[in-house]
UniProtKB/Swiss-Prot annotation:
<keyword id="KW-0472">Membrane</keyword>
<comment type="function">
    <text>Catalyzes the hydrolysis of epoxide-containing fatty acids. Active against epoxyeicosatrienoic acids (EETs) including 8,9-epoxy-(5Z,11Z,14Z)-eicosatrienoate (8,9-EET), 11,12-epoxy-(5Z,8Z,14Z)-eicosatrienoate (11,12-EET) and 14,15-epoxy-(5Z,8Z,11Z)-eicosatrienoate (14,15-EET) and the linoleic acid metabolites 12,13-epoxy-(9Z)-octadecenoate (12,13-EpOME) and 9,10-epoxy-(12Z)-octadecenoate (9,10-EpOME).</text>
</comment>
<dbReference type="InterPro" id="IPR000073">
    <property type="entry name" value="AB_hydrolase_1"/>
</dbReference>
<dbReference type="GO" id="GO:0016787">
    <property type="term" value="F:hydrolase activity"/>
</dbReference>
<feature type="active site" description="Proton acceptor">
    <location>
        <position position="382"/>
    </location>
</feature>
<dbReference type="Pfam" id="PF00561">
    <property type="entry name" value="Abhydrolase_1"/>
</dbReference>
<dbReference type="GO" id="GO:0016020">
    <property type="term" value="C:membrane"/>
</dbReference>
<dbReference type="InterPro" id="IPR029058">
    <property type="entry name" value="AB_hydrolase_fold"/>
</dbReference>
<keyword id="KW-0812">Transmembrane</keyword>
<keyword id="KW-1133">Transmembrane helix</keyword>
<keyword id="KW-0378">Hydrolase</keyword>
<comment type="pathway">
    <text>Lipid metabolism.</text>
</comment>
<protein>
    <recommendedName>
        <fullName>Epoxide hydrolase 1</fullName>
        <ecNumber>3.3.2.10</ecNumber>
    </recommendedName>
</protein>
<dbReference type="GO" id="GO:0004301">
    <property type="term" value="F:epoxide hydrolase activity"/>
</dbReference>
<feature type="domain" description="AB hydrolase-1">
    <location>
        <begin position="140"/>
        <end position="389"/>
    </location>
</feature>
<dbReference type="InterPro" id="IPR000639">
    <property type="entry name" value="Epox_hydrolase-like"/>
</dbReference>
<keyword id="KW-0443">Lipid metabolism</keyword>
Length: 404
């Protein structure tokens, strides 16, 4: 009953979390224990502290800090185990129905849509990255960073559009497509990823770049802008908030917490890779074509585009293991400078039909941008630069012209 008593005390003491956790525990019985743990986290921190949690936020001394971190780890482990059981059962049932064909790897030929591009490599300090370029080498650098589960081709509409004025470079991040794939999980930490961006810009002969990013590429771009602001001429992030704003949202919003289920699932070993690869990489089709979360304009994601994705995840030693390792580092990442104001001109483009991220985190991001602008694209999905390329390109053009 002590557990119940603490839970009730938390309900009374932390009213701003009441609606969130009551909804969690009452309407979603499977998450009752998660609701309890969330309230333990609330109990260990002052009402008006900033998020994410830090030593400076905690009003009750080091014991409260360590208790909070201990309970947080329990929460992550519980969710990790819950999704391990859930998706292991799904894979078992799938295997019972389809047998070995569920995990059969198909031989694929390179799709025509990947032909005719200027494909290059750059050797960095630790890895060799692949990139595709449009525009000439003597123009200002516009660097494109893709998200998950993507590769350079997700910027195909932008590579063509901006080639007349810029040297457009779309990289395959480490672990993707034709780039190197280090084996260890630690090789995919945020510090390693931001180091790659620094090395790419310098390796191409520049001291700064216009950085355009989406999803996980955006997380890398935000962190890069914090660590190396002098190397970011302008920053454009598509459907990705600042990490500090995202953490605020996931701690205080059941909507975002629920949408982020896969982050906990990806903490497991092997099962996520097996699920993503199963049934001829059905997961990719769901990501980009499902009504709720996929690209809304079907003409912008053809059957051949889908085949290009499957090709990139099946050739050259590619595996879902390496991109998923990004997520396996996410709970160990150092705390971002949530209150650091970024000085460079920054544009956030947001598709309002994003099934993975709440727009409120993007709006909150503007509070820490000195020259921040946000443009909403109504009805566009999380994959906004592919869903509405004409509108995205127009917003980027106006933004670049404004800050010439």
């Amino acid at each position: 009953m002590l557990f119940e008593s603490i839970y009730i005390q938390c309900l009374n003491k932390f009213s701003k979390y009441k609606k969130f956790v009551c909804h969690t525990t009452c309407n979603c019985p499977n998450y009752k224990i998660i609701g309890y743990l969330l309230y333990f986290l609330c109990l260990c921190r002052p009402i008006n502290c900033s998020l994410p949690l830090s030593r400076h936020d905690l009003a009750f001394g080091s014991f409260s800090y360590y208790l909070t971190m201990f309970l947080y780890r329990i929460l992550v482990r519980l969710l990790q185990f819950y999704y391990f059981v859930k998706f292991s059962a799904i894979l078992f049932l799938g295997f019972a129905v389809k047998g070995r064909s569920l995990f059969e790897k198909k031989q694929r030929e390179k799709p025509n849509v990947l032909e005719g591009w200027d494909s290059r490599y750059i050797k960095l300090k630790k890895v060799r990255l692949h990139y595709v370029q449009t525009g000439s080498d003597d123009k200002p650098l516009m660097l494109f960073i893709h998200g998950y589960p993507e590769f350079w081709y997700s910027w195909r509409f932008q590579l063509k559009e901006f080639a007349d004025k810029y040297r457009c470079v779309a990289i395959d991040q480490r672990g993707y497509n034709l780039s190197d794939k280090p084996k260890h999980v630690d090789n995919y930490s945020i510090d390693e990823l931001t180091g790659d961006i620094r090395d790419v810009i310098e390796g191409l002969g520049y001291d700064k770049a216009i950085v355009v990013a989406h999803d996980w590429g955006g997380l890398v771009a935000w962190q890069f802008a914090e660590q190396y602001p002098e190397m970011v001429d302008k920053l454009i992030c598509c459907n990705i908030p600042r990490p500090g704003s995202f953490r605020k949202r996931i701690y205080t919003s059941w909507s975002q917490f629920r949408k982020s289920w896969y982050m906990f699932f990806y903490q497991n070993e092997k099962i996520p890779e097996m699920l993503c690869s199963a049934d001829d990489m059905k997961m990719l089709e769901l990501c980009f074509r499902a009504k709720e979360i996929g690209i809304q304009n079907n003409k912008n994601f053809t059957d051949e585009d889908l085949e290009a994705w499957k090709y990139s995840f099946s050739m050259n030693g590619a595996s879902f293991k390496y991109p998923i390792n990004y997520y396996r580092n996410i709970f160990n990442a150092k705390k971002q400078q949530a209150d650091l104001v970024l000085e460079m001109p920054t544009l956030i483009i947001w598709g309002t039909a994003d099934g993975a991220l709440d727009i409120e985190a993007a709006v909150d991001s503007l509070n820490t941008l000195k020259q921040g602008t946000m443009k909403k694209i109504e009805g566009a999905s999380h994959w906004v630069q592919q869903d509405e390329p004409e509108m995205v390109n127009e917003h980027i053009k106006k933004f670049l012209n404004k800050y010439q």
